[in-house]
A protein has these predicted regions:
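Short, Lys/Arg-enriched N-terminal segments with co-localized hydrophobic residues
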Residues: 4-19
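Acidic catalytic patch
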Residues: 131-146
Length: 194
């Protein structure tokens, strides 16, 4: 795998393509997550802290608010995933973090603080994604929602939601950056697939 690019074989030119298995899909999404977050933070770093914190009438207010939401949301889900019966060693460092209680809070007041946490998180996500095994995906995960309601969902479906949530809010952040005059560049998943 080249830096920032993932290699996923989809079959040869002589045979019908074969589907990517679930573990490969998760690894691809973890790599895409890291690549896109780096692009977003590089783009955001061209703005001042005042521009980043400016209310843009977005769901999370500002660019900084949207990026904070992504980081807090990832933290919530990863802490839930740490309760999986497999006891993922890559997620143990999360035990020192408090569970976020408000996904709209600006927990990190500067891009530098947020960027440091984000870099730590996306490396943790990659390490964890590469530690997953196929049988891990077939469990149901018991957790509590942000409102305290008990929930029980298929683990693989929760992973799909986790990465989809990131993509959704990165799209919002990309729009806010574009409106602020910053070009994030190519954001397509295809850009990292060989």
């Amino acid at each position: 795998m080249t830096a920032g690019r993932a290699r996923f074989m989809m079959g040869s030119s002589r045979q019908e393509s074969t589907p990517v298995n679930r573990i490969e899909h998760i690894a691809l999404m973890a790599n895409y997550n890291q690549w896109m977050n780096r692009k977003l933070y590089d783009a955001a770093s061209t703005l001042t802290e005042t521009q980043l914190a400016a209310d843009r009438n977005a769901f999370f207010g500002s660019i900084l608010g949207t990026l904070n939401h992504l980081t807090l949301g990832d933290t919530v889900w990863l802490k839930r995933f740490a309760q999986h019966p497999a006891g993922f060693a890559a997620l143990v460092p999360l035990s020192s973090l408090a569970m976020p209680v408000d996904l709209k809070q600006v927990a990190f007041g500067t891009l530098r603080e947020l960027s440091d946490r984000r870099a730590w998180l996306y490396q943790l996500i990659i390490d964890w994604a590469h530690s997953l095994r196929e049988p891990d995906l077939d469990h149901r995960l018991h957790y509590h929602t942000m409102r305290g309601m008990a929930a029980d969902k298929p683990f693989f479906s929760l992973l799909v939601h986790f990465f989809n949530h990131q993509t959704h809010h990165r799209g919002q952040a990309t729009t806010l950056l574009t409106q602020a005059g910053v070009d994030v560049g190519d954001t397509d998943l295809l850009a990292i697939i060989d």
